[in-house]
Curated annotation (Swiss-Prot):
Source organism phylogeny: Eukaryota, Fungi, Dikarya, Ascomycota, Saccharomycotina
Organism the protein comes from: Saccharomyces cerevisiae (strain ATCC 204508 / S288c)
UniProt keyword terms in alphabetical order: Activator, Mitochondrion, Transit peptide, Translation regulation
Gene that encodes it: PET111
Stated role: Required for translation of the mitochondrial gene for cytochrome c oxidase subunit II (COX2).
Keyword Secreted: no
Stated name of the protein: Protein PET111, mitochondrial
Cysteines engaged in disulfide bonds, as pairs: none
Other facts: Present with 538 molecules/cell in log phase SD medium.
Length: 800
């Protein structure tokens, strides 16, 4: 079960109502005396002799420690006075006089070797620097954007912080906590951020931007409910927590990523009530058009007419003028494009679309950011419908707009076309020839790697584990994680392989879950495998009550697993959750239920009556008739598989012919699914000639190059239908089994070639990413050198 971290709501309340006159107590230590006469020697020798002098001195640090209320992370020390006494007796703190002689200059210049020296002194020599001394180095490192090194300092000194804080003034300690909070957020150490944020709001004058940082940390560490709870209590304490409209926008934008509409409505309407409910409220508290657009977009997406009307007629919303703005019209227009994605009965009328785009461009002449949003929405619409020709048309229009450049966000959207159509080589070429060759304008970002990674795994599923391991070995290097602080977390969150049984073997791919849902699904599978129904129910229940709201892919996978394991009651609950949370429910959900109904009915009777069998066949045909315009290739093939249970092979032939008509001939995966289902149908019909003809067609089709070990295994299994049941096969329709085996052998050779191609592309991808990472590191070092010069100049001015 996922555990809540940080502090309770009562803990929040105590922090919210802190004492304004609270001061940090100062404690005086008796520090051992040591000589500095050796400073005439080399600096390294100075330090060594100084440390030796410390070790020879038998006196101990002593002083008075006035205990203060601490949070959980300090409890291990402060709950037991003897623990702090032990630290006092074991560790020496550098005297300011000697720090100025031996260390200050190196701290100010952020000497490259100083970090290892600090770690070594604390670990091996029991020597510590004060927080005030450390801040000199930390500020220099932060200016140079060496957050990884600051993180190392925090890790080394975390256990000593209560000791050092006890003789540090409140202002200095607050500076230390604030910069550490920012750095840990940059490092994506969100659990640590929770702890530091608790200290920050206790000892610092809270800044608005730090509230955003804290809220984001809660959400990213799966403490969504705590984030909402903190926001709810903090918004009513403006003197302590100066939340501005910008924080509202950033909080909602963060929540939008997880489609948590319930929390978003609470956040938004609470703002209107507290910040805009009074006639004397400041106009700066009115929600901006950007904020209103988020709520508007989400309400349209969840298709709740009553709630949408309530939002649009709200007095505060009306007072902003949003409903009569071009931004309002743009959201409505973009939503109409979004709806096309989920409805095959609709298509984009290119002439009307471009006409409306041109009108928006004219009206948005002075609003560059909103104009960019318009272009992005149209690009997304064409990508979602795999319309590459018209995608090029809109890109040409963007290129003619002097105020808009095709940057990384556009590249991510455009390259999604290649991911959707499983064209790894096209995607690789696009990144190599377009994205990376922009003279450093398009910098490396995690989403670029994720696209290349997931596309490679989708196109070469038999190499999913090899590709993932190769990327991990290549990118999980210390020189990368030190400079690109997001690398380690990114790899950990995305290196989840999801394996499922398909086509007689295993089909592996990247899970598609976020890190939280992946953990939930693994726990759910474990409960189901142990027949722990109550535990499985608890996983679903907790996913709704705790942390980030569950996403569609997680709930769909849970539903499928429930039906496969006959957990019908729980499956119905999950189905209700799905249909409540998401506006667009793909047909594959209804097909899951149709398959379950037909199979469960079929298994309920040893021998179905002709009447009952016809009833099941009618349900299947009626489903196809009602949803004919919406059915995708995959849907038709799923319905064909259901026909095998009713033994309605004639109707199965019709369904598979419909799948062929709708098949995207450039999509490798669709070809594989089509051929495998066709071969299964031929074997069930005991038509060896048809079986051989399909194999021949597959071998001749160079666009259908995706073949997996599972395909080969299952095709060989199909052969048993002809070998064991010759009585069912008519002489006229039968052919020599040797011919079929020869064609299977040919398919095996094609598989070997395809796997070799995948290994070669895997090698190219790894080299490409390594090269891109190295170039990014070089750019970062150049930028760091420029900042070093500025830092040197600043230090020189201070000395003068």
């Amino acid at each position: 079960m996922l555990q809540r971290r940080f502090i309770s709501s009562s803990g929040i309340k105590r922090l919210l109502h802190r004492e304004s006159n609270k001061v940090m107590h100062t404690v005086f230590f008796k520090v051992r005396y040591y000589s500095t006469e050796l400073i005439k020697k080399k600096h390294k020798e100075d330090i060594e002799d100084w440390v030796k002098a410390q070790l020879k001195d038998s006196s101990t640090i002593s002083g008075v420690y006035e205990s203060r209320n601490k949070l959980d992370w300090m409890d291990s020390i402060t709950k037991s006075p003897s623990s702090l006494d032990i630290l006092k007796n074991q560790y020496n703190i550098v005297k300011d006089k000697d720090f100025g002689i031996l260390w200050k200059q190196k701290f100010e210049s952020a000497d490259p070797d100083i970090l290892m020296t600090i770690i070594s002194l604390s670990t091996n020599q029991k020597v510590l620097f004060s927080i005030q001394q450390l801040l000199i180095l930390i500020n220099s490192l932060h200016f140079l954007k060496r957050d990884y090194d600051i993180g190392q300092i925090y890790t080394t000194y975390e256990q000593f912080t209560p000791l050092l804080a006890s003789h540090t003034d409140k202002g200095t300690y607050g500076q230390f906590i604030e910069i550490m909070l920012v750095v840990q957020h940059n490092l994506h150490h969100f659990d640590v951020c929770e702890t530091l944020f608790a200290e920050y709001i206790k000892y610092c004058k809270v800044k608005p931007q730090m509230i955003s940082l804290g809220l984001n940390s809660f959400i990213r560490s799966n403490n969504t409910q705590l984030a909402v709870e903190f926001y709810t209590q903090a918004i009513t304490n403006p003197d302590t927590f100066p939340i501005t409209e910008k924080q509202l926008f950033e909080f909602l934008r963060c929540m939008e990523r997880y489609l948590d509409m319930s929390s978003m409505k609470h956040i938004f309407y609470l703002w209107l009530k507290v910040k805009c409910g009074d006639e004397q409220s400041s106009s700066t508290n009115l929600p901006s058009f950007k904020t209103l657009a988020i709520i508007h977009r989400m309400l349209l997406r969840f298709s709740n007419t009553d709630e949408l009307n309530d939002f649009l007629t709200n007095p505060v919303v009306l007072s902003t003028g949003y409903t009569s703005s071009v931004q309002f019209e743009l959201i409505e227009f973009c939503h109409s494009l979004y709806c096309i994605k989920g409805d095959r009965t609709k298509s984009i009328d290119d002439s009307i679309l471009m006409e409306r785009v041109d009108k928006f461009i004219t009206r948005l002449n002075n609003n560059i950011s909103t104009r960019k949003e318009l272009y992005m929405s149209v690009v997304q619409a064409y990508v979602s419908t795999n319309n590459f020709e018209n995608l090029k048309v809109i890109l040409e229009k963007i290129q003619r707009d002097n105020d808009i450049s095709i940057d990384g966000s556009f590249h991510l959207c455009i390259s999604r076309y290649f991911v959707n159509t499983n064209q790894f080589e096209g995607l690789f070429k696009y990144y190599r020839s377009v994205v990376k060759t922009t003279d450093g304008k398009t910098r490396l970002r995690p989403a670029f790697i994720q696209q290349l990674w997931s596309c490679a795994v989708n196109v070469y599923p038999m190499l999913a584990k090899e590709i993932t391991n190769d990327l991990l070995v290549t990118l999980k290097r210390s020189q990368y994680s030190k400079c690109l602080t997001w690398v380690y977390t990114f790899l950990q969150e995305n290196a989840h392989i999801h394996t499922r049984k398909i086509n007689g073997g295993e089909d592996s791919s990247l899970s598609g879950f976020n890190a939280v849902d992946f953990e939930r699904f693994e726990e759910f599978k474990k409960k189901v495998s142990h027949n722990d129904v109550y535990g499985a129910e608890l996983v679903i229940s907790n996913s709704l009550k705790e942390g980030i709201a569950p996403q569609f892919s997680f709930l769909y996978s849970v539903l499928a697993l429930c039906l496969r394991n006959s957990l019908t009651g729980l499956a119905r609950v999950v189905d209700v959750i799905l249909r409540t949370r998401f506006r667009y429910i793909p047909l594959k959900v209804d097909i899951l239920w149709l398959k379950w109904e037909i199979i469960s009915n079929y298994r309920s009777f040893e021998k179905l009556s002709a009447e009952h069998l016809k009833e099941l066949e009618f349900k299947l045909k009626e489903f196809e008739r009602v949803h004919q315009k919406e059915l995708s290739v995959q849907n038709y093939l799923q319905l064909t598989q259901i026909c095998f249970h009713t033994r309605d092979f004639k109707y199965a032939c019709y369904l598979i012919s419909q799948a062929r008509k709708n098949l995207d001939t450039s999509n490798n995966k669709q070809w594989m699914m089509y051929y495998m289902t066709s071969l299964k149908l031929a074997s069930r019909m005991h038509e060896s000639e048809r079986f051989s003809r399909i194999l021949k067609d597959w071998n001749c089709n160079h666009r259908a190059s995706l073949i997996t070990p599972g395909c080969i295994r299952q095709i060989k299994g199909f052969m048993k239908y002809f070998e064991k049941r010759p009585a069912y096969i008519s002489t006229a329709a039968s052919i020599d089994n040797k011919e079929i085996k020869d064609r299977i052998d040919e398919l095996v050779l094609r598989y070997v070639d395809y796997k070799y191609q995948g290994l070669e592309n895997m090698r190219k991808l790894t080299l490409f990413l390594k090269e891109w990472f190295d170039e990014e590191i070089s750019l970062l070092k150049l930028e760091q050198n420029e900042r070093k010069m500025k830092l040197f100049e600043e230090n020189k001015k201070e000395e003068e």
